[in-house]
Amino acid sequence: MAKKLFIQTHGCQMNEYDSSRMADLLGESHEMELTDNAEEADVLLLNTCSIREKAQDKVYHQLGRWKKLKQKNPNLVIGVGGCVASQEGDAIRKRAKHVDMIFGPQTLHKLPEMVNAAGKHIPITDVTFPEIEKFDHLPAPRVEGAEAFVSIMEGCSKYCTFCVVPYTRGEEVSRPFDSILKEVVQLAEQGVREIHLLGQNVNAYRGDTAEGDEADLADIIHAVAQIDGVERIRFTTSHPVEFSDSLIEAFRNEPKLVSHLHLPVQSGADNILSAMKRGHDRQYYIDKINRIKEARPGISLSSDFIIGFPGETDDDFVDTMNLIQEIGFDHSFSFVYSQRPGTPASNLEDDTPEDVKKERLAILQRRISQQAYDISLSMVGEVQRILISGYSPRDPGQLQGRTENNRIVNFRAFDPQLIGKFADVVITDAYPNSLLGELVGSELDSDFVLQ
């Protein structure tokens, strides 16, 4: 009987991608099958994130629950990966002696030998930052569905004062150009229609081609667009300083690149941006966005915001709110500031009271929610092209898909053959976090035109 693998993933899309590759790896090496029930698993993996406050506490709390499973089954193998593993290393095992394997994002390709060692009750830790060798050791991806992530680079070299990523994932290392395209081809052959290119600082990508040239993110986008079966391309996460002219031109000239961009700004106040060492000021960001809007009219924009960074005044927060209105963001990942151990900002006085941080955050989120709702209302009556991902989790009588500008659309339909296909829906109603539509055509129709 096949052994069972359970993976719990915390954090970003990079971690989601890494978890899927862990499953591919152990599926090939040990013929393991994924399960969503930890109690029936032979191997438990916790893929961790250290971006937010109390990340370590969250990890140890989960490991405490898994300890009970280990007591019932001493042969159960428990592994901790991801960014908390990189930060904590062997300290994890000092607090949780039942953990067999500790590995970082760059060493997950060694999981088969780690599992073998754990089977002999040999604990192992490897949180090193080797060159981007893991992709040379991973099997072909196995996917279900029409959308897939593809990691094109690892790490970040920006060293923003609040961020742990350079310390947990290492500095920027780009994956070879042809390695990326090979993975995309493998995904497209399995029916993937939308490719989401990933990197902690994805637009800093500078990868070698087989001809000895250097490719950037725009080159990747144009090459992926030429692969049979791929109809949509997204990328996350970008840095304003790395947003090149060639990438702006990709928005102008590449129709398969979607009309949505996530470009973190963190704050709208120049003194806070300087304290964060973001490498740009407010006006630089505005100018960059205006050029992107000129290249792709109607593009949907989202961003990251940190509220209550050390030194943030009421006036600084007003600057952030004014920037949100000027740019017209319709979504954000926004959080109150919390000190991350080992970062330069952790040496600064966290001088904004928590209740003030939370009040500012609520104001910001209300503003962006209203802007998002206004944009959604403006879409009512329009026909939108969506990629259908599956059934609505709230209503099995509805199918669900995503628009180019990253909005979820639910519509009444009962044909499972539509899943994984493109369709046109007319938007009939707008809600705070989704749209409702009616099907007007799909790839199942003989006269449907993709482009």
Curated annotation (Swiss-Prot):
UniProt keywords, alphabetically: 4Fe-4S, Cytoplasm, Iron, Iron-sulfur, Metal-binding, S-adenosyl-L-methionine, Transferase, tRNA processing
Residues annotated to bind [4Fe-4S] cluster 1: C12, C49, C83
Pfam families per UniProt: Radical_SAM, TRAM, UPF0004
Cofactor(s) it depends on: [4Fe-4S] cluster
GO cellular component, as recorded: cytosol
Domain TRAM: 377-441
Ligase keyword on record: no
Subcellular location(s) per record: Cytoplasm
Cofactor mode of binding and number, as noted: Binds 2 [4Fe-4S] clusters. One cluster is coordinated with 3 cysteines and an exchangeable S-adenosyl-L-methionine.
EC number(s) from the headed UniProt entry: 2.8.4.3
Radical SAM core domain mapped to chain residues: 142-374
Record-linked InterPro entries: Elp3/MiaA/NifB-like_rSAM, Methylthiotransferase, Methylthiotransferase_CS, Methylthiotransferase_N, Methylthiotransferase_N_sf, MiaB_methiolase, rSAM, rSAM_horseshoe
Top class in the EC scheme: transferase
Reaction catalyzed: N(6)-dimethylallyladenosine(37) in tRNA + (sulfur carrier)-SH + AH2 + 2 S-adenosyl-L-methionine = 2-methylsulfanyl-N(6)-dimethylallyladenosine(37) in tRNA + (sulfur carrier)-H + 5'-deoxyadenosine + L-methionine + A + S-adenosyl-L-homocysteine + 2 H(+)
Domain MTTase N-terminal: 3-120
Alphabetized SUPFAM superfamilies for the sequence: Radical SAM enzymes (SSF102114)
Sequence positions that bind [4Fe-4S] cluster 2: C156, C160, C163
A single GO molecular function term of this UniProt record: 4 iron, 4 sulfur cluster binding
Xref: PANTHER family: CDK5 REGULATORY SUBUNIT-ASSOCIATED PROTEIN 1, MITOCHONDRIAL TRNA METHYLTHIOTRANSFERASE CDK5RAP1
Family assignment from sequence similarity: Belongs to the methylthiotransferase family. MiaB subfamily.
Xref: HAMAP family: tRNA_metthiotr_MiaB
Subunit structure: Monomer.
Function: Catalyzes the methylthiolation of N6-(dimethylallyl)adenosine (i(6)A), leading to the formation of 2-methylthio-N6-(dimethylallyl)adenosine (ms(2)i(6)A) at position 37 in tRNAs that read codons beginning with uridine.
Protein name according to UniProt: tRNA-2-methylthio-N(6)-dimethylallyladenosine synthase
Organism whose genome encodes this protein: Marinomonas sp. (strain MWYL1)
Gene of this entry: miaB
